[in-house]
């Protein structure tokens, strides 16, 4: 007789190999065909709402690994919240306006297209990019409203953005003024703080002499009768700002010295600088010197000095006063700072505080980085090309004390990677410290209070965002571009004042934009709205900062507080969002701009919590770089290993810091995935012939180890769900993997194989095991589904067509309409957990002893062994309570418990009996049945009798 055929060997259509790269696209297609996202929405309707608002990626170029991390994390959260009993929509979005797309249009079609053509081509280009990115995001297994995403260039979004601008204008936050702003010559526009990055750069550092212009005043300040000729010396790394110098700054409390230098410099023997910098500076200049008098900076306020190029050209025949400033330091230089108010924020504030008007500020640098032609000596030159010319002119004028090359971290445009400057321009600002119209807190005050009311994951994000808001300047809202939402103001041609009906006019423009897009503003004849007043006003040509685009999506998409704007997806979503989730750079980007617009419009943040993830680096911790050759593209991983492996990598990595990825790291992820898949395959194979409706054993009648397994599963599920609740995915993955490999694979399933395979197919012993396995399988699949979406769906379809095929409340379409599994509670759960925890510890000790004997050649498999356990007290009672089932727990052919004092003692003896050909146990009764001499008595009764007596394991 072929006894192998009498075993209940497992069988399942769920394959051992996932073949993920080949099979995943079919699942993506099936989810679309079956309208799975819509099915989730229908199943979730009426539940408490959870809103994760998608930070929009920019609609330009293929997605990179950072995009994949971001979208997978969002997908895990949305799926886990839906399965936890929430109504969690996912509406993906795209950021569509702005410079990068405008640059692409210029590259393709040239720089001199009419604005209407630029806008039309930019809109078409953005749609092409969105289609490419959407395909890649869907390939990652991300479910969402892909057919109806929000786009910042949707007409309704553009219109509501204009309404949002009107809202903050009415509340008193918006003003126009001249201020130094971050300016990129390549963009030809102001930049937001978030668009500035820093890179090392070498610049000339110069020490420049400003000759004395008020010697009597200087003598009096130092308590001297008179002074000889001389100069005050400044240090700067921006020689190009010297032509625009209008003041000098000293610290009121620092001590300044008059030094008689030898040999005498060109402007005279006396030099003025900070006392603490005298020795270092004289050494650098190759001079000897003697301090003849000192005075505090406060005594020097208002003194005047000639421009260092006054002798070179009459255009520089002016003097610069000393203004006092606490920001002057002694870290480098001379303790005296030269001030060109058009090109530095502190310089600007200082000069304005001392009465300099906007019209008085010298601003010779044009938007393209060249000096105005009217500038003496350097007109028409690029400021970078002018640096050496200015240094030569200073030298010729006798005003150059020293020049060195300095490598330092300097501001660059994040798009062009070129250096930028501060440049005073007339811009529209949102004031951080202006009192709003209602007299309430300033924007800075309300934003800082909002940060305190927001939850942060990880917690350090709070301090980071707080510091940024506390120290940031006013927000430059305006940009000088074509592809952007217009600041649709009518400005008086003579006074520069806004039209008195601006609020009403903005709404009228918004209504037109709602129908025809921002192009409606471009084509609008002012007479249509202003009538006879049109000749007095001009259309403002500025566009809104793209960070205002994305920063107002909480209003334009979610609808704003109390659905004030009735956003594009306000019916599905809600305000404020429960969560914003982006990379750590968004503390100065989307988190930041959204906070400011939320506080301006509604007095509070548009989110309840912020989650930040780190950047992706290679296995050595290096930034991804094409030049280094360490870039890992998500498309390539999906096409080779499968998107499931990327999802598992994301979930199993601590995203609060940098996320490391490499081929070697992905190999380890693949190994972890295989172990999980093998566990699932075993579970599915062993419930394939089980029917949940007609064959389930009541929970109170389950074998003891089966009840323990369900208790163990419930504990694991509670831990994983707690991790999900806190967005801690890597410990959740670790717990799931440990459960599969140790709790199931190395313990419960290992013990269960004998009962599943050898007892009668319909016996209580086997059905008890299958009842527990089915609950475990359902719980496990649902817990894995948010992360291993493809695999969980594949396994669920197998389960739904086998063990669950007759269960009415089970989804046949998708696992994602399910909620987390309700595991049965047991009154003795704590006692079960404690008992079996000790039994597992004893089992581990027995396994170590068995391995020693196996290594020594005494036995082959553990079933060849017989075990004698010597124990007293609780251990003896524990072991004895299992009766003959103890041998199945230990996976040996005999296990006998003996009363003994002291610690547990284990003795292993190779069995002297024959091996049963069916169950492989070595038993005394093998051959006792004449009709079946090859098998043991237990197998005989399982095959031909009432079945073995057994109720523990």
Swiss-Prot record:
Its cofactor is Zn(2+). Transmembrane segments: none annotated. Binds 1 zinc ion per subunit. It is an enzyme of class 6 (ligase). CDD domains: Anticodon_Ia_Ile_BEm. GO terms for biological process: isoleucyl-tRNA aminoacylation. GO terms for molecular function: aminoacyl-tRNA deacylase activity; ATP binding; isoleucine-tRNA ligase activity; tRNA binding; zinc ion binding. It catalyses: tRNA(Ile) + L-isoleucine + ATP = L-isoleucyl-tRNA(Ile) + AMP + diphosphate. A motif ('KMSKS' region) lies at residues 623-627. L-isoleucyl-5'-AMP binds at residue 582. Its EC number is 6.1.1.5. ATP binds at residue 626. SUPFAM superfamilies: Anticodon-binding domain of a subclass of class I aminoacyl-tRNA synthetases (SSF47323), Nucleotidylyl transferase (SSF52374), ValRS/IleRS/LeuRS editing domain (SSF50677). InterPro entries: aa-tRNA-synth_I_CS, aa-tRNA-synth_Ia, Anticodon_Ile_BEm, Ile-tRNA-ligase, Ile-tRNA-ligase_type1, Ile-tRNA_ligase, M/V/L/I-tRNA-synth_anticd-bd, Rossmann-like_a/b/a_fold. It is found in: Cytoplasm. Belongs to the class-I aminoacyl-tRNA synthetase family. IleS type 1 subfamily. Monomer. This is Isoleucine--tRNA ligase.
């Amino acid at each position: 007789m072929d006894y192998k055929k009498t075993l209940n060997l497992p069988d399942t259509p769920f394959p051992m190999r996932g073949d993920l790269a080949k099979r995943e696209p079919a699942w993506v297609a099936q989810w679309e065909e079956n309208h799975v996202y819509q099915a989730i929405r229908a199943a979730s309707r009426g539940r408490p709402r959870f809103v994760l608002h998608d930070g929009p990626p920019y609609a330009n170029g293929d997605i990179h690994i950072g995009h994949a991390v971001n979208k997978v994390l969002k997908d895990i959260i949305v799926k886990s919240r839906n399965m936890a009993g929430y109504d969690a929509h996912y509406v993906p979005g795209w950021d569509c306006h702005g410079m990068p797309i405008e640059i692409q249009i210029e590259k393709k079609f040239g720089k001199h297209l009419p604005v209407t053509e630029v806008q039309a081509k930019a809109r078409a280009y953005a749609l092409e990019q969105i289609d490419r990115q959407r395909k890649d995001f869907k390939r990652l297994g991300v479910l969402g409203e892909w057919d109806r995403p929000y786009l910042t260039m949707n007409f309704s979004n553009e219109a509501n953005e204009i309404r949002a601008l009107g809202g903050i204008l009415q509340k008193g936050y918006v003003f126009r003024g001249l201020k130094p702003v971050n300016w990129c010559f390549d963009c030809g526009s102001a930049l937001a703080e978030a668009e500035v990055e820093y890179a090392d750069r070498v610049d000339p550092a110069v020490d420049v002499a400003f000759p004395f212009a008020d010697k009597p005043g200087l003598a009096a300040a130092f308590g001297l009768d008179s002074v000889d000729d001389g100069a005050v010396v400044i240090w700067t790394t921006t020689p190009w700002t010297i032509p625009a110098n209008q003041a000098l700054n000293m610290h009121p409390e620092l001590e300044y010295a008059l030094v008689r230098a030898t040999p005498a410099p060109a402007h005279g023997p006396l030099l003025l600088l900070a006392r603490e910098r005298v020795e270092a500076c004289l050494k650098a200049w190759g001079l000897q010197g003697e301090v003849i008098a000192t005075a505090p900076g406060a005594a020097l306020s208002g003194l005047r000095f000639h421009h260092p190029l006054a002798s070179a050209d009459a255009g520089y025949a002016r003097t610069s006063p000393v203004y006092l400033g606490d920001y002057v330091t002694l870290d480098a230089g001379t303790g005296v700072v030269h001030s060109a108010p058009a090109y530095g924020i502190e310089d600007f504030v200082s000069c304005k505080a001392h009465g300099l008007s906007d019209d008085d500020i010298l601003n010779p640098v044009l938007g393209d980085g060249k000096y105005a032609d009217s500038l003496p000596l350097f007109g028409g030159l690029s400021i970078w090309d002018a640096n050496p010319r200015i240094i030569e002119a200073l030298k010729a004028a006798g005003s150059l004390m020293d020049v060195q090359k300095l490598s330092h971290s300097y501001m660059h445009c994040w798009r062009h990677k070129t250096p930028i400057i501060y440049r005073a321009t007339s811009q529209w600002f949102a004031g951080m410290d202006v009192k709003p119209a209602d007299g309430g807190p300033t924007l800075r005050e309300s934003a800082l209070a909002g940060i305190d009311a927001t939850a942060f994951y990880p917690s350090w994000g709070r301090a980071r965002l707080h510091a940024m808001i506390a120290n940031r300047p006013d927000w430059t809202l305006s940009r000088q571009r074509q592809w952007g939402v217009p600041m649709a103001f009518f400005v008086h041609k003579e006074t520069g004042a806004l039209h008195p009906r601006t609020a009403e006019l903005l709404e009228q423009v918004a209504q037109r934009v709602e129908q025809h897009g921002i192009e409606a503003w471009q084509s609008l004849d002012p007479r249509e709205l202003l009538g006879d007043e049109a000749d007095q006003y001009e259309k403002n040509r500025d566009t809104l900062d793209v960070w205002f685009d994305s920063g107002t999506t909480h209003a334009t998409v979610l609808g704003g507080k109390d659905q004030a704007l009735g956003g594009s997806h306000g019916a599905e979503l809600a305000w404020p969002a429960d969560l914003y989730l982006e990379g750590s750079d968004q503390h100065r980007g989307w988190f930041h701009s959204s906070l400011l617009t939320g506080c301006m419009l509604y007095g509070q943040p548009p989110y309840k919590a912020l989650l930040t993830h780190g950047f992706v680096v290679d296995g050595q911790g290096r930034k991804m770089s094409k030049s280094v050759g360490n870039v890992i593209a998500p498309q390539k991983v999906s096409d080779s290993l499968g998107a499931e492996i990327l999802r598992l990598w994301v979930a199993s990595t601590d995203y609060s810091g940098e996320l490391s990825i490499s081929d070697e790291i992905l190999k380890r992820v693949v190994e972890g995935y295989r172990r999980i898949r093998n566990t699932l395959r075993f579970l599915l194979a062993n419930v394939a012939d089980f029917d949940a409706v007609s064959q389930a054993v009541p929970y109170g009648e389950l074998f003891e180890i089966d009840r323990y397994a369900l208790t163990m599963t419930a504990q694991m599920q509670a831990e994983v769900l707690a991790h999900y609740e806190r967005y801690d995915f890597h410990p959740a993955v670790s717990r799931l993997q440990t459960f599969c490999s140790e709790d199931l694979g190395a313990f419960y399933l290992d013990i269960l194989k004998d009962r599943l395979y050898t007892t009668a197919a319909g016996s209580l012993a086997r059905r008890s095991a299958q009842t527990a396995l089915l609950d475990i399988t359902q719980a496990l699949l649902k817990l894995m589904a948010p992360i291993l979406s493809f695999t969980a769906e594949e396994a669920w379809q197998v389960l739904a067509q086998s063990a669950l095929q007759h269960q009415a409340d089970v989804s046949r379409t998708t696992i994602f309409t399910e909620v987390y599994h309700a595991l049965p509670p047991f009154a003795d759960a704590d006692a079960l957990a404690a008992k079996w925890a000790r039994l597992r510890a004893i089992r581990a000790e027995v396994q170590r002893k068995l391995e020693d004997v196996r290594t020594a050649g005494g036995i082959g498999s553990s079933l060849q062994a017989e075990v004698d356990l010597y124990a007293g007290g609780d251990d003896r009672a524990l072991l004895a309570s299992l009766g003959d089932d103890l041998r199945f727990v230990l996976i040996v052919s005999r296990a006998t418990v003996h009363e003994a004092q002291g610690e547990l003692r284990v003795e292993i003896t190779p069995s002297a009996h024959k091996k049963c050909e069916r169950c492989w146990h070595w038993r005394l009764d093998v051959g006792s049945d004449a009709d079946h001499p090859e098998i043991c008595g237990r197998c005989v009764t399982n095959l031909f009798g009432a079945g073995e007596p057994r109720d523990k394991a």
